[in-house]
C-alpha cells in the first residue's frame, strides 16, 4: 500500500460487501475517477468506503482504491482526512453518525459537513445585516395564522419543507378572489404531483395543519422574480475552496423553470443557460441585471459567512433570485450541491478542488 496520506471518502454510492460488483471489476462514477487522479496530483491516495466498512478495532477501512486506473476493494489504514459524501437523507443513519463520531474523536479532519436545515441557515445569515437585506423575510411556521399575516404584507408566500430539496413539497399561496386562495406546488406532498387549486380560508388552514403534521416548514416572503417565456428565472452559483482555503467560483448557471411552474429546479423540468443568454433574453425589457461582479461578490460573502459557522465547509451551491430592479435575493443554500447542472469541465474542476482543499487541511 502506498505511503501517501489517504483521502477517505465516506459514501453510500459504492457497492457494499455483499454486492456482486464488489468482487468483480468495478469502476465508480467519472467524478470519483477524476478525484482519484486529482488526489494523486496533490500527493494523496483516494479511498472510497461505506460507513459500515470502517474497522475501528483493526485501525483500518475496507474500500475502493484505484491503482493504475484499476479499482479494487481492499483494506487500507485509516484515512488521514475524510470527505463526507453521504446523501443528505442518509446522513443521520446510525452507521454514518458512528463513523463521523469515530473520526472526530480520533482527531481526523472531516470536511463537507451538513450545515443545518433551512431555518438554521436563515438564522445564521440574519446575524449579518448587510447579507440579511438580500434574504426574503423568513420564519419558522408554527401555526396557519402566520400565513395570512404575511400575506397582508406580500402578494404571495411560500411554504418550504425544512429538509426539502429539488423543489419537493414547496407550496405557493396567494390571494385569489372571493376570499379564496390560490395554492400551487410543483411536487406536492407525498404524491410528488403538481397541484393547482383554489381554496377557502378554512380549507387552506386544514391543508397547512395536515402538511405540518407530516414535516416542519419554513414560511417565506414571495419575491417577484423575473420570468422569461413564463418561466421563473434564478441563478445557481457553485463555489468551492481551493489549495489556499479560499473560495473559488466554479460555475454560474442561469436556471429557467417550466412555463408557469413555481420553481426553476432542473429536477422539476427546468432548463440551464449561461449569463449571456440571460442578457439577450431581457434586452429591450424593463429589467435591470446586476453586474456579474455583484453576483460573484455576494456569493463569496455568503460563503465566507457560512465558513465561520463551519470552518471545514468545502462547497456551496447558492440559489440567487433576481427581481426586475436588479436586486439579488438568497433563495436557498446547498452545502452538498448537485453537479447535474454543471458541464464536464466544471465537474472536473470540482474534483480538483476537493483534492486541493484536502491537501490544504492536512497542512494546517
Residues covered by each model-derived region:
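A short glycine-rich, hydrophobically flanked beta-strand micro-motif that places a catalytic Asp/Glu
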Residues: 47-51, 218-222, 234-235, 309-325
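Redox-cofactor binding/interface segments in oxidoreductases and associated redox assembly factors
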Residues: 9, 83-84, 159, 220
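Short, flexible/disordered intra-domain loops and linkers
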Residues: 15-27, 91, 341-343
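Short, flexible loop/turn elements at secondary-structure junctions
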Residues: 86-87, 114-115, 142, 163, ...
